[in-house]
């Protein structure tokens, strides 16, 4: 059982330790202390949900319906472009970290945005649902699959909360407007690049 849990834990680690859109959003939320723990909670929940969807064998639906993947990809492109351009605008105009700016984002908006970054990217499904779900087929027993999924979900939770908390602790050091502009610029460029990459992938799916 422990071995199965550890396999899931480290497989998820190999997939999530990348500078993707979801990680950037969690990082930025932590740096601005904008409901960063809520963002981490939503991100962790979505990852766990997708992992268990894959482990329980629902991945075949996503694989067998190309139109679903393409539609999700198109929505994801628009989502990433919107937030990427928003970050570039912040890099140009600046973003002051203050009490007022922390309150500017409502709880509902925070949850919806976190859901968007967690669910509107086909690559997330390919990693969590298809890859992890596919790997879990080596375990014939449903109990083993559960522990495998629990291991993968545990790493996601540790990672997102750790990232949000560390970013929050470092926010005072990076609260200088110039530093925030640089962070926004880097985030914006990466998000736009991810949108372009996703667009190329979507074209290849036709």
Predicted regions: what they are:
Residues 107-128:
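Selected transmembrane alpha-helices and immediately adjacent juxtamembrane segments
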Residues 7-11, 42, 112-117, 151, ...:
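Alpha-helical transmembrane segments of MFS and MFS-like solute carriers/permeases
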Residues 2-70, 129-147:
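Juxtamembrane transmembrane-helix termini in multi-pass membrane transport proteins
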Residues 196-206:
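Juxtamembrane boundary at the C-terminal end of a transmembrane helix
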Residues 9, 13, 17, 48, ...:
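Hydrophobic/aromatic residues within the transmembrane alpha-helices of Major Facilitator Superfamily
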Residues 34-110, 166-169, 186-189, 196:
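Membrane helix-loop-helix hairpins that form the core translocation module of multi-pass transporters
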């Amino acid at each position: 059982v422990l071995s199965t849990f550890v396999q899931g834990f480290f497989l998820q680690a190999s997939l999530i330790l990348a500078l993707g859109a979801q990680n950037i959003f969690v990082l930025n939320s932590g740096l601005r202390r904008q409901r960063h723990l809520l963002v981490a909670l939503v991100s962790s929940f979505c990852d766990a949900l997708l992992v268990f969807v894959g482990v329980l064998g629902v991945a075949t639906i996503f694989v067998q319906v190309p139109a679903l993947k393409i539609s999700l990809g198109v929505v994801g492109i628009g989502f990433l472009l919107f937030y990427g351009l928003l970050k570039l605008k912040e890099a140009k105009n600046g973003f002051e970290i203050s009490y007022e700016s922390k309150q500017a984002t409502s709880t509902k908006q925070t949850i919806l945005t976190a859901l968007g970054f967690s669910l509107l990217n086909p690559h997330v499904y390919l990693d969590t649902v298809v890859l992890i779900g596919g790997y879990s087929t080596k375990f014939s027993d449903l109990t083993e699959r559960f522990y495998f999924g629990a291991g993968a979900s545990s790493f996601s939770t540790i990672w997102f909360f750790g990232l949000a908390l560390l970013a929050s602790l470092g926010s005072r050091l990076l609260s200088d407007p110039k530093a925030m502009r640089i962070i926004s610029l880097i985030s914006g460029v990466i998000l736009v690049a991810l949108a372009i990459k996703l667009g190329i992938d979507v074209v290849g799916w036709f």
